[in-house]
Structures are given as structure tokens and as C-alpha cells.
Amino acid sequence: MSIEKVPILGKETIHVGYGIQDHIVTEVVDNLASSTYVIVTDTNVEKTPQFSKLTNDFTKVLNEKRPDSRVLTYSVPPGENNKNRATKAAVEDFLLQQGCTRDTVIIAVGGGVIGDMIGFVAATFMRGVRVVQVPTTLLAMVDSSVGGKTAIDTPLGKNFIGAFHQPQYVFIDVSYLESLPTRQFINGMAEVVKTAAIWNEEEFTRLENFSKQFLSVVTAKNPDLLSIKEELVKTVLESVRVKAEVVSSDEKESSLRNLLNFGHTIGHAIEAIVTPEALHGECVSIGMIKEAELARYLGILPPVAVARLSKCLVAYGLPVTIDDKLFLQRVGPKRHNIEIDLLLKKMSIDKKNDGSKIRSVILESIGKCYQLKAHEVSKQDLTFVLTDEVLVHPFKQPPQENVITPPGSKSISNRALILAALGTGTVRIKNLLHSDDTKHMLAAVAALKGAEITTEDNGETIVLKGNGGDLVTCDEELYLGNAGTASRFLTTVASLVGKSESNDHVVLTGNARMQERPIGPLVDALRSNGSEVQYLNKEGSLPLKITAGNGLKGGRIELAATISSQYVSSILMCAPYAKEPVTLALVGGKPISQLYIDMTCAMMKSFGIEVTKSTTEDYTYHIPKGTYKNPAEYVIESDASSATYPLAFAAMTGTSCTVPNIGSSSLQGDARFAVDVLKPMGCKVEQTATSTTVTGPPRGQLKPLPHVDMEPMTDAFLTASVVAAVAQGDSSTTITGIANQRVKECNRIEAMITELAKFGVKADELPDGIEIHGIDIADLKTPSIEKRGVCSYDDHRVAMSFSLLSGLCKEPVLILERSTTGKTWPGWWDILHSKFNIELDGYEPPFGTDKEGTKASDKSIIIIGMRGTGKSTLSEWLASFMGFKSLDMDVYLEEKLGNDIKSLIKEKGWEYFREQEAAIAKECFSKFSKGYVLSTGGGIVEGAENRQRLKDYITAGGIVLHLHRDLEETVSFLSVDTTRPAYTSEVKEVWLRREQWYDDCSNYHFYSSHCNTEEEFDHLRKSFVNFIKIITGTEKASIPSGRSAALSLTVPDLNAISSQLGDIAVGAEAVELRVDLLKETSSSFIADQIAVIRKHIDLPIIYTVRTESQGGKFPDNKVEELRNLLLLGVKLGVAFIDVELTAPVEVIEEIIIKKGYTRVIASYNDIAGKLGWSNVEWTNKYNQGVSINADIVKLIGRASSLQDNLELEVFRKQNTLKPLLAVNLGSQGKLSQVLNTIFTPITQESLPNEDGLLTIKEINQIYFDIGGLTAKKFWVIGSPIQHSRSPNLHNAAYKALNLPFTFDRFESTDADQVYKELINKPDFGGLAITMPLKLDIMKYATELSDAAQKIGAVNTLVPLEGGYLGDNTDWVGITSSFTRAGVPPNPRVNGLVIGAGGTSRAAIYALHQIGCEKIYLANRTTSKLNEIKDSFPKEYNLEVLETEDQAEKAQNVGLAVSCVPADKPLDESLLQKVEKILANGEKSSNGFKSTLLEASYKPRVTPMMKIADEKFKWRAIPGVEMLVNQGDRQFQIHTGFTAPYDVIHRAVVEE
């Protein structure tokens, strides 16, 4: 038995060995005399053979040597959640009960939880007793057991209460690891890697080399630790030595010991959020990488060190990112809780901080920390490192001169790795690009056993010993991310691979984008040469399954090389290993990127194989058989494509930059960029054979480049494009020769055009290029953060290019997916920050925002459904709302084939038509994949190929929307439709055949009610648009911040009460559909019920299927039916879905994954009232709801006494992480229903009510009775106001909701009088303000809304704490009047405001909020209009129409607001202007009827309305609608309640 002793604090008290239980017992009994030895462990360790042996031996030896002493054992529950005050107290109570005294020796046997907590017990029991640590997990052995730190957790964080208490001994018996679960084993390696990373580079290198053997042993079904015993003991020993040395220098963590916290500042914060699902080491592993990236960002740690640390952690099976696949599986929905503000909050209360200043350990190199202490780091820098979105601030003071060395070339790096792996001998590769691409390539080479790979020079040099092309298959898929180069090179390499004992094929796969990128021509060439390659998903793209053992036949290979030169290079490099010499003929025209092909040939020559070009045939190469001979050293040239970014920075900012190792002799085509692009644009360029310097002209003086062929340097076109964006002159900049850029990481040409437009730069697509119309730097627009800034498309070159243009804007610019630059330049942002002095900020989007940046709304939406279900009409509505183009695929087919469908079927039959339909579907889904609504023919689901294509579209993240309506209505419509071919069978039969297909092939479903009137059509459109908002994420349902109620609809069929629904829903902010109480639960019936609600109520729908055990009617044993019903709710696009926490875990998880933008209410119902609110089970259920990231947690109990309600309120105050809906049912539970704030379940007298729910009137009355509501007085003020309808409106709402408020008139023209007599009274509730006080009353407003500020007047005043809020709701009256009249959101028309009075300013504000791109102003005189125009921001784009000619030229006006007096004759000159505009209204409306709103409500029909309606066929909205709608919003501001709209409308309109 070998035992290593490690000194700490001057004593050799740390003993390390394998199987040392006997030594532990002897050492303790001989040297630590005591009357009582207490062995404390947890219930897991208690069951291990090692623990049994330890306790048995202890008892035996104690009886022999100290017969008067006793040994006690005590077990605690396992897990971090039991490391708390309660468990500590339980241990202490046990010790006291057993009569333990100060001479007690406590032996803590277990993992970190036991060591920390029992050490703390020892530190405080009897003011301190002796403790011995016997760690049983790897993490405890190398970390928590050494150094004397003890602690317990609190709700606010880990280890906040504890003490330093050094153990008498630490006995590390590595044999305990034999029973350690694999995940715990790997977890401990994080701390091992950490200690080596901060202290011992030599040990770190050993760990790098040990990883593969370690992982293979610990992940085996029956791990054999004896096979790695020596290495394992050394691993523990070296880590312990580091910690012991550090602790000996700084026992109480005043300085040096802080180094042990590397990775913990961020890691602990993550752990606090995702514990217990994620383990300590897993979180610290992520923390180490983030803190290493921080050090790199600060310019201290080299990029290669970050890459090396990351690779080592991954090699031990540890996560290095929050979005690691396995980490995400483990933490589940808690991933959504990892938000930057919460992380920073957790970090700010870290123990090593200096007050609230966050401190972190900064790594300088592997094995060394910067200045041997923790450093204060800014929240700004931390936010940047912790987020994947970046705000690039304006380039204010960049250095005048700079020298930047880009990382190694990606192209050369990947080629060098392939050649070296296929070669024989050892090569030292220097300046290799350490990026995602090369990481995937290295991993693949290692997995295929192509080479032995090690590192030297602190990771700067890769030492690769090639196996001469002798590769074998591996069991796992080779995942390549979005590494296009690696995927193409490895496809041919995989064809050379031999079979292993366990596998006969290689699978290459990648991320979603990689699975869209083309590889077909290469596969075709390989197949023709004997390789067996199978597509596993989409034809022409990864994943690929390549059968091993076939190899390449050799001989002549023909390859299409007009798309990618990488296909050519892939075959070239592998050709020497074919069975016969290869002649590679490139067919289809001139190959793309010839210089890259030349590069490959030159590199092959460096590795001993010379390629010769054919002298008789163009684009043809002869490659001999042979084996590469690896050179002793190969230096990778810096990446010329990457070098374009710092050089372009100099060009755009008027500064100078030198790239010292890329010049005219470079192998890379992109080395020409400075000379061929920047120099003609006005830059001074100095280029030698090995270096390039660019000096830009004064900022803003770049010249456009009329034409440049960038075929030799296609990747650099993106950099050229952003330079051209700010190059002004007589011409545009035209770039050609870049057709291949459409099939890179994204369609780069399309991406460039789309993103440049966000900066106000117009660009046009050319057949093989792009034309850019540069603008003045001062005219650059700042892309909207709200609209998600600049999308990078997961493309490194897009992100880096736009980082340059962003800095020229006046405001910070948001760029998404910044980490995508890791493909070629992981440290690009660090260079911008540390070398160019650019301010960067991390950015985290608001919760619920699509973090991909490419919103669901960018992707085309496909519409399916039976003929006659409204596909054409609803498609137009959808296209109008989304800003998409609408394409009827039947019409497209007819145009393409030159024949109408009816004739086509008559002539050639249904089978031919279906074949053509399938071909058109394939074309359209690809060609029109973005920005379209694709309306399909009713029978598209008849063909299996089309059905699969629709399913694939859904899998790829697209929306396929199934539209349906009442079958009888459909039959009636089709019976008179003669424009389409007749069905070969009855309509009902066709529907029954297709019904399941429609369901299988769609992920959303909208059931449209039959409409008879224009009003019903308007309402249908509004409800349809609301549905679209939810399914596209354009607008998620809001969670009320104030008191709110939800009406529970408990009837078996809503059709029976449909006409009453508006009145029944008074007082509700949402309606709950109890699906389990419906008379049937077929999908069609439920869809009909949802349609009924949407037809009659404009409220969010809560979709609930309550099971029997939870108080409902749905059978508990029908789990699959429950799952299907919940998924149906998501498919129907409801705002909220109720998910019972008692449902099977797999059902809950599936709903969470597939919910889209529907919000989740996690519910639990204790219908029997068995649980009191002090029972821990309620807390467990609440936490369960939080853990699945529910939007609301709903807990329902049953009260048997008043006390139950009071306990519930205590519970409510204690649980605030997520909004809580908690009430008690039954007659005793009414108080809880009154005190609940979010979506309180309510009923109406006419509805069944078995649960004792209250009506909204009852709730408000009781709330008033107990003091929750106080009586308030509201007034309308101004003069004259005797005819004001505001009192009617507000008092009707107060009565309907039973609110203790009154609303009256107060006629006055004196604001001071109003303040004295109304505002300054204790019962003052608020004002509705009319002329002449809209301006005068503003002096009493301590805060103004944005609307009030821009409109320059207030019509609403309410008290705030310490002051008053002034608001203006006139604009809401305008916008709501338009939308309720059928005007869609984002109507994409221009607006017209008639008049120049006070209301005209509200109209301008309203039309801008609606989305009018331009707003025309017309009035009798224009002087006042010019004043109004000058007072609004430029982006309102206001144009004053001074003449009739100008009015006639006004374009695309579809909305108008008349703000001229209605009781006076219309001015003739003004009328002439208005009529010129109204006359063009029919062609201006964008899918809706052009609409005019009258601002005057007397008379009901004004002269302007008559002209608009009768003469020009515009829709005219009377002013009374504006009055109602502004009052609706005003009521909400006054009271916090939602106004009952139908009630207030009747009160005003029917007066």
C-alpha cells in the first residue's frame, strides 16, 4: 500500500493512496485520542463496500486499542439541497442527544456536501471540535476537503455561512472512486483541470494526453480503475499539491488563495441558477471558459490558450458553453433562467468580492495567473463575455496607427491537417488557426485514428504524427457544426477509411445550416468512382453515411466545380490514395476560385506529391499514386480573408493599419484585397512580399469602385461591400465574380443586401454579384435594436464585416450571434476592443425574443387546406400583416404550364396534374423560402412526396398553417364554384380522406367562422391577425402587471351562448376554455369552440384540459389523448396553455419544447383540500413550475377556514420568482380569490359554477369592503362640457365592474381652480381634459408620457406617488378606431392628416405608431403645418401639401384623419387637395379598404365623411368611435382595470 503525504500549513496531514482504509483507521485511532468518534456520511455512501469496511475496521480497532471509546454513525440525506441550516441542526441535535463533548472527533465521509457541512458542524459544535475529512468523490478529493473551508448554503447563494476550520487529516482513498457514477467522476475533473491551468503547465499537458484513456475507462459499462490506477492517483495528487501549496501561503483567502476560484466567479453564478440539475464542476467548466475569454478580451490571454483550455475540458466530457447539448438536456427549461441580470446579481454577492465590486481570476497563460491575484472586472466586460449579442459603439478615437496579426489561414490550416493526417512522419504545424472549424477537423482526424496529435509551446504548435492514410471508422457521428471546409474535405477522406471491428461506415453531420449547404457535386463524383455515399436527410446535403472499405478506384473523375473549389481540393488531396492514378477533370465551365485550387496543389507539393495540369484538356489535373511525406515543420500563413477587416477599418476611419505577415507572395487570393479594392477606392497601400499597410483617406472621402471582379477573392466581397456602403461619388460600386457566395454559411449576397438596407444603404443583386449605392457617413441609419439589429446568419464574415460599418453609425448597433466569428477569428471582438479601442457592450434580448435573429416571420409561411376555406383571402391578409408577397401556387402552376388547371386535368388527367403540383411545390418551397405566403392547392397533401416535404418544412422551423371552416359551408361554396375541376368524389369523402393528412402536415390550425357582413369580416381579420401574432412571435400575450381576472367558460358547447359571450366576459382580461367540460373533444369541435370565442371576444384564450385527479372531467388514464389535446391547443395558437404539473414528465417536456410563442401556465390543484399552505409540497409544486420556466404558476387549494386564506397570502409573499395565481376554492376561500392579482378565476351568474367562484362584481365589492379599493372621484374638465359623453362612458364601466368610483363634469377654464378644487383633494382619482385646458394643466404634471410630449398636450391626468402623470389617449382613440374597422397592423400605406388644430398632432403621432412610412399634411393655410412638421422628429417623414399638384402626386395614401371643424363649411381649396388624394385611395389600400376617420363626433355623419364614403368609396369612421376608443384607454390609465368595451360603446353611441 503506497501512501503519498502532502504538506499543508507545515504539517503532512494530507494522505493520498489507493485502498487505504486500514491506514485511515490506524492513523486516527493512534494519533487522535477521543472518547467519541462520530462517522457522518450520506445515505448513498452508506451503502458502499468501502464505507462498510471503514466502519467495521474502526469498531474492531477501537475495541482493541481504545476499549473505553465509542464510535457513532449518522447519515444525512444526499445532495446540495440538503446542505442547509436544517440538516446541520439535525446533526448537532444528534451529537447533543448522544452526549458528545469537546473531545469528540468527527469523521466526515462523503462528497463535497458532507465535507463542507460536517466541517462546519465541527467548527461550531462546542466552539470547535476536531474533524477528519475522508472525501469519496473526485471533486471533494481535489477541492473541498483540502484547505479548511467549511460552509452551508442559504436561499441567496452557496456557502454564505461557514468558517475556516482545518481538518486534522485529509485521507484521500482513490479506491472510493470505484463506486462513483460516471457523471460525478467527470464533474470532478473540472477542478483538476483548473488547478493545472492556474499553476502547472506541465501537469496540464499530461492531463491533455490522459483525457482519452480516462474517458474510455470511466464511461465503460464496468469501469476498471485499476487499469489507470497510477495515472489516476497522480491526477489527484498533483491537483492536491497545487491547492495545498496555495493554502499554505494564504490560509484565510486574503490574496493568493483567490486563484483557486478561477472559473468560479461565473461558474458559481450559473450553478446558483441551475442547481441541482447541473453539477458544480459542469458549471465551473463553463465558468473557466468564460473567464478565459474575459482574459483574452482584455488582451492578456492568447487565443490559443483559450482554445487549448476548451479542448481539454471537452476531452474530459465537460461542457464549455451554456448551450452545450448535454448541459441543456440536464438543466432543461432552467436554461431560460440564466439571464445576464441574474448572473451579475449572483456574482455581485460572491464572497471574494470587494464590497459589490466583482472580482475574477485572470489567466495569463496555461499554468500562470495574471499578477497572482483576483482582479476587479467591470460589469460591462462581463456582460460582453456572457452574451452572444454585441452592441458596437461609434468609433470615436481609434489609434492612428496599428499593427494587427490575424490568426492562421482557415483554408491553409484545414488543408495542412488533412495532408499531415494522410502523410507519414511527424510535422510541427505552427500558427494553426485555433477555431471552431479546425477544432472540428482535429477532432475528426483523431476520431478516425488518422494521426497522433499533441501540442508544444503552450499549445502554439500542433505536433501531428500521421498514419499514412491508414484510417478506421469510429462509432460516433462526426459532428462538424457549420464547418463547410471540414465537411467537404472529410467527405472524400471518409471514402478512404477502413472498417473497424464495431462499425462499417462513417457518418458526417452538422448543424441546421450545414444540413442546407450543398455537397451534391462532390458526392456524385465520389459515387461515380466507387464510393458508397448515402444522404440521411435532405438530398444534396449533410448528414452523409459513407460506407467504409470501398476506397477510390482512381482513373478519370469528372467534377462540377462551378459552385465550390473545395470539392476540387477535397478530391485532389485524397487522390494519391486511390487504387489507380487519378485524372480529375473539372466540367461545367470555368471553376470557381481557381487560386484556392492552386493553393491546394502547392501545398500537396510541400508534402511530397506533385500535381500536373493537363496540356491537352482545360481544367484537368493528373495526380499520381503515393503517400505524403510530412515536413519537419509547416508554418501556416495568416488568413488573408481575415486580414481584410483590420485593413478595411483603416480605410473607413482614415487611420493606418499594417498586417505584417501577408503580402504579394501569399498563396491566398484575398491578399490582393488592399491593392485591387482599397487602393482604387482612395486608400494609400504599401505592400511588400510579406506585409501590407493601408492608410485610409479622411473619414467620408472613400470613392466608389465602378467595377471589380472579385472571383480570385470571393470571401472578401463582404468586406468590400461595407466599405462601398460609405463610398460616395458619381457611380455605385459593382462587384462581380462572387456567385459561389450564395452557398456559403448563408446566401451572403442576399444577406448583404438585406442588412445594408437596415443602414439605409441600397444594394442590388446581380447574376454573379452585387451593386452597392454608397451614401454619406452622416446619412447612415442605425439599425433598430427593437427589430433585432443586424443578423449575422451564423456567418463569421457577415458578423465581422458589419462590425466595421456599425461603428460609423451615430448610435450603438446590435449584432447578433457574435460568437460565430470563432470559425476564423475567435478573438476578433477582443482585437476591436483592445487594439482599436472600440467600446463594446454585451446585449441580452428581452425574454421571449427569438435569439436567432432570423425571426419566424422571415421564413415563408405555407398555407394548406380544402378548396373554399378562405386560403386566398386569409393569405392576402397574412401577407399584408407580415409584409410578405403572396403567391398562389395553383396560379403559379397555370402560368408556368400555360394552361388552366381545369383544362389541364381534362386533357392529361389527375395523375399528371399531381406530378406537376409536386414539382411546383419543390420549386416554390426552395425558390420562395423567405418573405412569401405560399397558398397551396387543396390536394397538395394527396401525394406522399408533398406530405414529406411539408413535414420537412416544419422540422426546419417553418410554419405550415392549415385553414379550415365549417364543412357544410365549404360544400355549399364548392357546389357553385365552376372555376376549378370537379372533385372525383363527394366533398365530404375528400375531406375525410385528407383530414389526417392536413393534421400531420401542419403545425398550426386556424378555423374561420362563416362571415355574412362586412363587420364580421373585419372581426375575422382582426382575430386572424391576433392568431398570426402569436404563432410568429410578433407579439406574445402579455402577463398583466395589475389586478386581472380570467373568465372560466364551463359550458359544453359555446355555440349555445355565443351571442351572450361579449356580456358574459365583462371584467375579464382573458377567457379560459375548459376543454374537459366540452361535450366532445374532437379536434374539429375544439377548433370550432376556439373560433366562437375569437368571433365574439377580443381576449387572450387560456386553454385548459383539467384531469379528474385535478378536479376536472378528463380521464387520468388517457395520457396519449391528453398529450394530443395539449398539442392541439398549441396548434390552434392560443395565448396561454394550462399544463398540469401532475402530467407525465415526457408530456410536460414536449409541450415546453413545442409551445412556440404560446405562454405556459403550470397548474396544480388540491381539490380535496388535503394540503395546508404551510405544507412544503406547495413550495415543491411552485418550484417545479419555475423549473420548467412556466410563465405563470397556478396553485389551487380548498379552504376550510379563514386561516387557510391567511396562510396562502404568506405563501404568496414568499414565492415571487414567477407570477403566481393562487386561490382557495369553496365558500371559505372567497378572501383568497379577492386578494389574488393575476388572472383570478371568475364566473358569471349565467354559467355553471361548481367551484364557488365569484363574479367580478362580487370580487370588487369585497375588495372595497376590506379596504383594497378606495372611493375615488374622476372628472372631465374644460369648457364647454355640458354635452361631454365622458361621464356616460366611465360611469357605465364603473357600474358594470362594481367599482366605487364616480365620474362627473367640472366646467372651468382655469387650471389653478381645477388644481385647488379637484386635484388637491384626497379622493382625487383622475381627469379627462378637454379644451381649453389641455396645455394649461400640463404644469401640474410631474411626468409626461411620450405621447403627451410629442403631441404637446394632455387629455388625461392621474396621481402618481409624489406627483401626477400627464398622458394623451387621443392617439389611441385614432389607432384603435382604425384597427377595429379592419385596418391591419403595419398596413404599409401612407397617411393623411387634414387640419392643423390640436387633434392633428395626435393624428400624426397615431399614424406614425400604426406604421405609416410617410404622413401628408393638408390644411387651408400651410404656415401652421410647417410649425407642426418642424416640431416632430425627422423619422416621422412629414410632408406639407401646399398645392393641388403636390396633393395629386401624393402616393399610396390609405389612411386619413380629418381634424377640421365639422360644424363649418369645408374650405374649397382644402377640399380640392383632399379630393385629389382620396381619388387615388382605391389603388392605395394594401389589402384593406382605404379608411378615413372623422375626429369630430358631432354630427354623426360629417361632410368630410360623406365625401369620402359616397364620392370616393372610402370607409368612413364616425368620430364617436374615436371618443369611445380614447375613453377605453383613459379608463385603463385611470383605474388599472380593462374597460368592458361593449358596455362603454353602448353608453356613448346609444345615448
Swiss-Prot record:
<keyword id="KW-0479">Metal-binding</keyword>
<dbReference type="Pfam" id="PF08501">
    <property type="entry name" value="Shikimate_dh_N"/>
</dbReference>
<feature type="region of interest" description="EPSP synthase">
    <location>
        <begin position="392"/>
        <end position="838"/>
    </location>
</feature>
<feature type="binding site">
    <location>
        <position position="264"/>
    </location>
    <ligand>
        <name>Zn(2+)</name>
    </ligand>
</feature>
<feature type="binding site">
    <location>
        <begin position="136"/>
        <end position="137"/>
    </location>
    <ligand>
        <name>NAD(+)</name>
    </ligand>
</feature>
<feature type="binding site">
    <location>
        <position position="149"/>
    </location>
    <ligand>
        <name>7-phospho-2-dehydro-3-deoxy-D-arabino-heptonate</name>
    </ligand>
</feature>
<feature type="region of interest" description="Shikimate kinase">
    <location>
        <begin position="858"/>
        <end position="1048"/>
    </location>
</feature>
<dbReference type="InterPro" id="IPR027417">
    <property type="entry name" value="P-loop_NTPase"/>
</dbReference>
<comment type="similarity">
    <text>In the N-terminal section; belongs to the sugar phosphate cyclases superfamily. Dehydroquinate synthase family.</text>
</comment>
<dbReference type="Pfam" id="PF01488">
    <property type="entry name" value="Shikimate_DH"/>
</dbReference>
<dbReference type="InterPro" id="IPR008289">
    <property type="entry name" value="Pentafunct_AroM"/>
</dbReference>
<dbReference type="InterPro" id="IPR013708">
    <property type="entry name" value="Shikimate_DH-bd_N"/>
</dbReference>
<feature type="binding site">
    <location>
        <begin position="191"/>
        <end position="194"/>
    </location>
    <ligand>
        <name>7-phospho-2-dehydro-3-deoxy-D-arabino-heptonate</name>
    </ligand>
</feature>
<dbReference type="GO" id="GO:0003855">
    <property type="term" value="F:3-dehydroquinate dehydratase activity"/>
</dbReference>
<comment type="pathway">
    <text>Metabolic intermediate biosynthesis; chorismate biosynthesis; chorismate from D-erythrose 4-phosphate and phosphoenolpyruvate: step 3/7.</text>
</comment>
<dbReference type="GO" id="GO:0008652">
    <property type="term" value="P:amino acid biosynthetic process"/>
</dbReference>
<feature type="binding site">
    <location>
        <position position="127"/>
    </location>
    <ligand>
        <name>7-phospho-2-dehydro-3-deoxy-D-arabino-heptonate</name>
    </ligand>
</feature>
<dbReference type="InterPro" id="IPR013785">
    <property type="entry name" value="Aldolase_TIM"/>
</dbReference>
<dbReference type="InterPro" id="IPR036291">
    <property type="entry name" value="NAD(P)-bd_dom_sf"/>
</dbReference>
<dbReference type="InterPro" id="IPR001986">
    <property type="entry name" value="Enolpyruvate_Tfrase_dom"/>
</dbReference>
<feature type="binding site">
    <location>
        <position position="191"/>
    </location>
    <ligand>
        <name>Zn(2+)</name>
    </ligand>
</feature>
<keyword id="KW-0057">Aromatic amino acid biosynthesis</keyword>
<dbReference type="GO" id="GO:0003856">
    <property type="term" value="F:3-dehydroquinate synthase activity"/>
</dbReference>
<protein>
    <recommendedName>
        <fullName>Pentafunctional AROM polypeptide</fullName>
        <ecNumber>4.2.3.4</ecNumber>
        <ecNumber>2.5.1.19</ecNumber>
        <ecNumber>2.7.1.71</ecNumber>
        <ecNumber>4.2.1.10</ecNumber>
        <ecNumber>1.1.1.25</ecNumber>
    </recommendedName>
</protein>
<feature type="region of interest" description="3-dehydroquinase">
    <location>
        <begin position="1049"/>
        <end position="1258"/>
    </location>
</feature>
<dbReference type="GO" id="GO:0005737">
    <property type="term" value="C:cytoplasm"/>
</dbReference>
<feature type="region of interest" description="3-dehydroquinate synthase">
    <location>
        <begin position="1"/>
        <end position="379"/>
    </location>
</feature>
<dbReference type="GO" id="GO:0009423">
    <property type="term" value="P:chorismate biosynthetic process"/>
</dbReference>
<feature type="binding site">
    <location>
        <position position="116"/>
    </location>
    <ligand>
        <name>NAD(+)</name>
    </ligand>
</feature>
<dbReference type="InterPro" id="IPR031322">
    <property type="entry name" value="Shikimate/glucono_kinase"/>
</dbReference>
<dbReference type="InterPro" id="IPR001381">
    <property type="entry name" value="DHquinase_I"/>
</dbReference>
<feature type="binding site">
    <location>
        <begin position="42"/>
        <end position="44"/>
    </location>
    <ligand>
        <name>NAD(+)</name>
    </ligand>
</feature>
<dbReference type="InterPro" id="IPR036968">
    <property type="entry name" value="Enolpyruvate_Tfrase_sf"/>
</dbReference>
<keyword id="KW-0511">Multifunctional enzyme</keyword>
<feature type="binding site">
    <location>
        <position position="243"/>
    </location>
    <ligand>
        <name>7-phospho-2-dehydro-3-deoxy-D-arabino-heptonate</name>
    </ligand>
</feature>
<dbReference type="InterPro" id="IPR006151">
    <property type="entry name" value="Shikm_DH/Glu-tRNA_Rdtase"/>
</dbReference>
<dbReference type="GO" id="GO:0009073">
    <property type="term" value="P:aromatic amino acid family biosynthetic process"/>
</dbReference>
<dbReference type="GO" id="GO:0003866">
    <property type="term" value="F:3-phosphoshikimate 1-carboxyvinyltransferase activity"/>
</dbReference>
<dbReference type="InterPro" id="IPR010110">
    <property type="entry name" value="Shikimate_DH_AroM-type"/>
</dbReference>
<feature type="binding site">
    <location>
        <position position="143"/>
    </location>
    <ligand>
        <name>7-phospho-2-dehydro-3-deoxy-D-arabino-heptonate</name>
    </ligand>
</feature>
<feature type="binding site">
    <location>
        <position position="187"/>
    </location>
    <ligand>
        <name>NAD(+)</name>
    </ligand>
</feature>
<dbReference type="Pfam" id="PF01761">
    <property type="entry name" value="DHQ_synthase"/>
</dbReference>
